[in-house]
Amino acid sequence: MAKLHDYYRDQVVNELKDKFNYKSVMQVPRIEKITLNMGVGEALTDKKLLDNAVADLAAISGQKPLITKARKSVAGFKIRQGYPIGCKVTLRGERMWEFFERLITIAVPRIRDFRGLSAKSFDGRGNYSMGVREQIIFPEIDYDKVDRVRGLDITITTTAKSDEEGQALLAAFNFPFRK
């Protein structure tokens, strides 16, 4: 079992219950899922780029990614409906907690010129989204075998009702917010 999951159950739940005066432990916000998305627009010309992106995302998440397809045709981007243009992974349960732990302790501190993550990236319902410019911050990616540096979007979906609750939840895990 992931250390952060134990830490959440043993300490974070009680802290947040006291802070927000919840009547039940079930009212305390929790992390529901973490979604990783990698858009590969260049996959239109070179199909191998998408395969490499899928391999990178599989290495980072430990789970096989789903290839996302274009929802509608956009002439300006030379995209037709149904073209494969990216990949995504939704992590829940044990894998989610393990990834969250790796993200906070290993990956985020390896970001170049890192000064903390913006606390303004909440969506109004307690979910946090962040972008990573380079996939090489994750230790699972071998720097020498990378064909191209790609970014990815990471969305942390919580059961929090407001941004304040969501931020308190992530801050309880020592999430590196900018001061």
UniProtKB/Swiss-Prot annotation:
Keywords: Ribonucleoprotein, Ribosomal protein, RNA-binding, rRNA-binding, tRNA-binding. Pfam families: Ribosomal_L5, Ribosomal_L5_C. Disulfide bonds: none annotated. GO terms for molecular function: rRNA binding; structural constituent of ribosome; tRNA binding. Gene3D superfamilies: 3.30.1440.10. One of its GO terms (cellular component) is ribosome. One of its GO terms (biological process) is translation. InterPro entries: Ribosomal_uL5 (IPR002132), Ribosomal_uL5_bac-type (IPR020930), Ribosomal_uL5_C (IPR031309), Ribosomal_uL5_CS (IPR020929), Ribosomal_uL5_dom_sf (IPR022803), Ribosomal_uL5_N (IPR031310). This is one of the proteins that bind and probably mediate the attachment of the 5S RNA into the large ribosomal subunit, where it forms part of the central protuberance. In the 70S ribosome it contacts protein S13 of the 30S subunit (bridge B1b), connecting the 2 subunits; this bridge is implicated in subunit movement. Contacts the P site tRNA; the 5S rRNA and some of its associated proteins might help stabilize positioning of ribosome-bound tRNAs. Belongs to the universal ribosomal protein uL5 family. Part of the 50S ribosomal subunit; part of the 5S rRNA/L5/L18/L25 subcomplex. Contacts the 5S rRNA and the P site tRNA. Forms a bridge to the 30S subunit in the 70S ribosome. This is Large ribosomal subunit protein uL5. It comes from Pasteurella multocida (strain Pm70).
